[in-house]
Amino acid sequence: MRVAVGMSGGVDSSVAALLLKEKGYDVIGVTLKLSSIVCSNDIQVCCSPQDIKDAKRVASYLGIEHYVIDWEDIFREKVINYFVEEYKKGKTPNPCSVCNREVKTGRLAKFVNIVLGADKFATGHYIKIEDHPVYGKVIKRGSDIKKDQSYFMALLERDVLDLLIFPLSDLTKEEVRKIAEDYKIPVSQKKESFEICFTAGKTPAEYLLENNLLAFESGDIVHIDGKTVGKHKGLPFYTVGQRRGLGVRWREPLYVIEKDAERNTVVVGEREKLLTDHVSSEDFNFLVPVEKWKKEGLSVQGRYRQKAVKIKDVSIEGNRLTAYFEKPEERFAKGQVLAVYDGDILLGGGIIV
């Protein structure tokens, strides 16, 4: 079987390629060129020129073919432009989930299958993919819960699942690092990438500001009861649930409740005002057909590494899904992905509204 591995030049994807080769697969490496940014050594992003060099070194070390695909224009159109437009609307987008659908996983899996003749596409994500007796092919949380990345796959098209392999599904990060060291893989000591890959270590607001991608306008910070309590320095600097850095004096701590792009205001309130009994999402993507969903025991996640929140019911109108919490929970940020789970099984996801 011919398996293409998405190689980022990091430890995880390098070990994924190694493990597949050790199992006897016909392995090829594929690396995307998504950015021309050259970062300093203390900033780890992905898909940069240095990462391509690292991926080439690893592929050569493993003795596998390696291809570089220049999708910088596609990445700009599908991910960066989306990121900017969502911030213009006052939202807090999750570009990594969109990227996995539009570029790094969904699109690339189809590309290597059609163009390079690969039967399967593998990545170094900490995710499981299994056959379920009721749901069919499903994505599940990885064994290393601290590193689980299933949340970022919530927007994937269902027909891609049959192409995917995740060799690190049952491993921990520590075990993967140990394998890399034992096999003397050239990037075994490389640091992890934690940032949004195209911001080069900057916060989203800093990236938007420094690249003149968005006009930052100061506006009012308004208490949920209607009183103006301060000034904000631009909506991208704030997100729902934020408490620190508001610059507002009040009799008790205030939190960001909402960002109103039309009025250019940040709405704040006490913690109890942050609580809600539901969350809604649009353009919901069903990885498991909704008619197969269980009626109870489901949970939702509204950002990466957030603890799953139990829900008691869901309602669906067209492409809009609303989940109702078992008890009041803090609001989720608009623009993030709402992922729905049955235990460890990812049922689908949509964009929070």
From Swiss-Prot:
EC number: 2.8.1.13
Disulfide partners: C99-C197
Subcellular location as annotated: Cytoplasm
Any one Gene Ontology molecular-function term assigned to this protein's record: ATP binding
Reaction equations catalysed: S-sulfanyl-L-cysteinyl-[protein] + uridine(34) in tRNA + AH2 + ATP = 2-thiouridine(34) in tRNA + L-cysteinyl-[protein] + A + AMP + diphosphate + H(+)
Family the entry assigns: Belongs to the MnmA/TRMU family.
Protein name listed in UniProt: tRNA-specific 2-thiouridylase MnmA
Organism, scientific name: Persephonella marina (strain DSM 14350 / EX-H1)
